[in-house]
């Protein structure tokens, strides 16, 4: 019975951890939506080949801050906010706009991770369900443990002197 309870606690912690991971991945997926589907590894390969790509977010009226020597690609827009990829053959460059971090993983990889973790979460939730079906065993073990504890407490409180026993 206690083994079931320990399993249940362990599974509950795993479920909570998986739910948190899925939540974080879903937030990352939402953050990446504006950039569309691309492989961040491709950006790294281009960098190794001497082509630097940086991602920026800016207001439409800030486009004039970008020097003409750079190739500017508008990836998407959300109202007056633009999401840009700026391409250069310079080793490094700085533009007075809000630079966005290149993601570690692309949308496809994030969605695949969400799916895998979702399947794993469902499996753990099924295990919890199966343990709940065995809850009568856990309750029985709990009652037996309480009875045993009561007996041990009574036994520990007993004393004896010669032929007289007392509590």
For the regions a language model picked out, list residue spans one by one.
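Long, charged N-terminal accessory/stalk domains
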Residues: 1-167
């Amino acid at each position: 019975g206690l083994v079931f309870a320990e399993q249940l606690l362990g599974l509950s912690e795993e479920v909570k951890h998986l739910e948190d991971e899925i939540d974080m991945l879903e937030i990352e997926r939402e953050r990446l939506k504006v950039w569309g589907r691309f492989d961040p590894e491709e950006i790294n390969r281009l960098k190794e080949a001497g082509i630097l790509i940086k991602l920026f977010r800016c207001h439409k009226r800030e486009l004039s801050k970008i020097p003409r020597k750079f190739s500017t690609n508008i990836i998407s827009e959300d109202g007056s906010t633009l999401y840009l990829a700026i391409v250069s053959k310079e080793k490094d460059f700085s533009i007075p706009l809000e630079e966005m971090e290149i993601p570690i993983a692309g949308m496809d990889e994030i969605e695949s991770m969400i799916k895998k973790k979702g399947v794993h979460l469902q499996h753990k939730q099924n295990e919890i369900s199966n343990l709940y079906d065995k809850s009568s065993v856990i309750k029985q073990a709990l009652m037996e443990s309480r009875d045993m504890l009561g007996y041990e407490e009574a036994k520990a409180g007993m004393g004896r002197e010669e032929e007289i026993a007392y509590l």
